[in-house]
Structure formats: structure tokens, C-alpha cells
Amino acid sequence: MPQIEKDYIDTGKMKYVFMDFPLPMHGQAMKASEAALCAGDQNKFWEMHDRLFANQNALSPEALSKHAEALGLDTTQFKECLESGKHAAQIKAAMAEGQKAGITGTPGFLLGFVEADGKVKATKKISGAVPYANFKTTIDELLSSKK
């Protein structure tokens, strides 16, 4: 991702939108996604996201609280958010959108354009952890087709 950010996002050639897609086979993935969004309520989404990915064996409710504490979050607010399921509908909507676009696993990437109505029209899909060169080829093809 860092090279894509440098070459395409930071230069304004493309925009990056992250959508949660917790897989049902991972029993704690949904709560982990909610935890990242609850951390986002306190402006720490990416910090929590990265921490959870780095600690995938520590996703129990107790571990999520410890992650929140380590990030300096207001733990009372974080726990209330997590227990309320405040972000569950948002995550389920993102999953439905991803499934509709053909995403079946993670990581999954949709590349496309923003239409006049503000909706993203995905024209290419990349599945799995692939090398930067694959992204570069696909992105460059899309960008040149839009000229």
C-alpha cells in the first residue's frame, strides 16, 4: 500500500476508500471491525486497524479493550460503543456492497471511477495480496482509459 499511496493517492490520481469486510469464518472479525470504527469515533481508526491486524490472535473483548487503552482512547466511551453495536449496520452494508461487486475474501480491491451522482462504479477487481506491479498495471490502464 505505501507505494500505491505515494504514486497514486498522494498525487491525486486516485482516491482510496476503505470498507470493512469481516469474514464470517473468523468468529471475532465482526467485533474487531466494530472496534476499529469505535476507535475512529475518537480519531484513531487507522491506529486501531493496524494494531488489530498486527495482533490477530488478540481480538477477544478483553483484548480489544486493552488495545483501546494502549492507544490512549477513552475506554468508557470505546466500550459503550462496542457493546452497543453502533457500527454493525454500517459494516453489514459495506459487506453487502462488496459481495454485490464480487468480493469474496480479503484483501479485495475494487478499482473504478466516481460517477456524477457520487457513486463509485467499479470496473476492475483485484483479489488477494498481489504485488505492486499488478496494481500499477491495472491502475494505469484505468487512468489511461478515462482520458
Label the model's feature ranges.
Residues 1-69, 74:
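Structural alpha/beta surface segment adjacent to cysteine/selenocysteine redox centers
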